[in-house]
Amino acid sequence: MTRSVLLAAALLAASAPTLASDVVRHKLANPMLPISGAVEVPAGKTLVFVSGAVPPISNTSAPKDSVQAYGDTKTQATGALRSIEAQLKEMGLTMGDVVKMQVFLVGDPAKGGKMDFAGFTEAYKQFFGTAAQPNLPARSTMQVAGLVSPNFLVEIEVTAVRP
């Protein structure tokens, strides 16, 4: 009888869904960057690929066809990340479920055409590596020549794992 119970318990445990905590986030060798060096997703997990998010208009008094309407890199990144957060929430996910992020930054005219990595990082740190949401995704950040609108400085894609 005991043997049957143990066998049943083992089979039940083996068929139980994998918990979100089963995702392994490997620390980056350089602890100065708030990202994971790598993220392992166990077999059987559902990956959710979220299309690129661009910023909403943040300054309604600026001309709609201007960079000023969308703000600087930090403002644009914050808006895009809020959009991603809302989209994930609609799917029953959170920013803590994000395992991979790709960030496309256009050179900021106010910064001599160079990407504002520091401004992006300030926005990013509001959503990742906080006391409330400590999970860090693996991330790639790159400067690109342009995005779909000449007024966008930021576009962000994420991949999340369904817990």
Question: Regions from the language model: what does each represent?
Answer:
Residues 2-82, 86-102, 108-163:
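N-terminal presequence-like segments and the immediate start of the first folded domain
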